[in-house]
């Protein structure tokens, strides 16, 4: 039985940085690799195509937000929206 290509775990990005497309892409790729998942396997587990996962991990524009959320939830990445202060105008 031959082993497939081993996935090299990438470090977790600085999650205290302001939210950006690049940060989300880095976080998804880091979590996937830390779980030892190749792109094909992760895409299958997340219910998206490998092409979509690659686009998201590379920070490509034009991907559906629903796909990003599906991947984040499947990989256990939490997205939190904090309450904001209301302006009294």
Residue ranges, per PLM feature:
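N-terminal flexible/basic segments that precede or flank functional cores
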Residues: 1-23, 86-89
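Residue-level signal for the short linker/turn that defines the boundary of a DNA-recognition helix
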Residues: 26, 35-38, 63
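Short alpha-helical DNA-recognition segment
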Residues: 36-54
